[in-house]
A protein has these predicted regions:
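A short acidic/glycine-rich loop-to-helix N-cap element
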Residues: 201-202
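Solvent-exposed residues in well-ordered beta-strands and their adjoining turns
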Residues: 68, 193-197
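A structural signal for short, well-ordered beta-strand segments
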Residues: 44, 140, 190-194
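Residue-level marker for buried hydrophobic side chains located in beta-strands
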Residues: 78-80, 171, 197
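Active-site metal-coordination/substrate-binding segment of hydrolases
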Residues: 75-139
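Acidic/histidine-rich catalytic neighborhood of metal-dependent amide-processing enzymes
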Residues: 115-189
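Acidic-glycine-rich active-site phosphate/pyrophosphate-binding loop
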Residues: 87-103, 166-167, 182-193
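N-terminal helical capping/dimerization or prosegment-like subdomains
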Residues: 2-79, 83-89
Length: 202
């Protein structure tokens, strides 16, 4: 198959998967199990192993799936990471936000950009990874409730620690206007102690 045909196939498969993903109404705080089942099914058919972690109510789910390297080595794995939840729908939509609509070569639907589009691309490429002579593991990490407080990711991270799954190169497919971003804002809290004499100058 030519490179051009491969690209066409990848594009069409990405659009098909994205169309399916948009159809899952995974608003933050709501059940995302059906979407996780869909993703897990695609990956397991390709030979991936997976496990899940949950919120306290067992209705919101993280998925962590792995396509193993063909040979044993110490190369760091690649982690393709994305969140499955979307923000609630506001007014102003001219089409059903949970039905993918293509207009003027653009695809519209809640979460199409942030960030079901990346998840669709990762899943569309998975068959290529599964047939390749991988020299490192490829992980797929799909989490819940990023939009509200990044609730799902810490639960998954604790399970990764418990299973002693080593860190690696993590690609988080958030929309960035096609720019590579190698850092993100965050916060850290410090408690400090000082010794000395109080003073003031003006």
């Amino acid at each position: 198959m030519s490179t051009e045909n491969n690209l066409d196939l990848l594009f069409n498969n990405s659009v098909k998967i994205l169309t399916d993903l948009i159809g899952f109404k995974t608003i933050s705080g709501e059940d995302n199990t059906a979407l996780i089942n869909y993703c897990d099914d695609i990956l397991k058919k390709l030979g991936a192993t997976s496990f899940r972690t949950y919120d306290d109510e067992k209705k919101r789910v993280n998925l962590f799936a792995t396509l193993k390297a063909k040979s044993s080595n110490n190369k760091k794995p690649i982690i393709l990471s994305g969140h499955t939840d979307v923000v609630p729908v506001s007014k102003g939509w001219s089409s059903d936000p949970f039905t993918a609509t293509i207009k003027d070569d653009k695809l519209y639907g809640r979460g199409s950009c942030d960030m079901k589009g990346f998840i669709a691309c990762a899943l569309a490429y998975a068959p290529i990874y599964s047939k390749s002579n991988l020299d490192r593991d490829i992980h797929f990490s799909f989490t819940f409730d990023e939009e509200t407080a990044c609730i799902g990711a810490p639960i998954l991270i604790e399970e990764l620690k418990r299973r002693n799954i080593k860190d690696g190169i993590c690609i988080v497919g958030e929309p960035t206007n096609m720019k590579i971003i190698d850092a993100h804002k965050g916060c850290y809290e410090y408690t400090t102690h000082f010794k000395g004499l109080a003073g003031h100058s003006s």
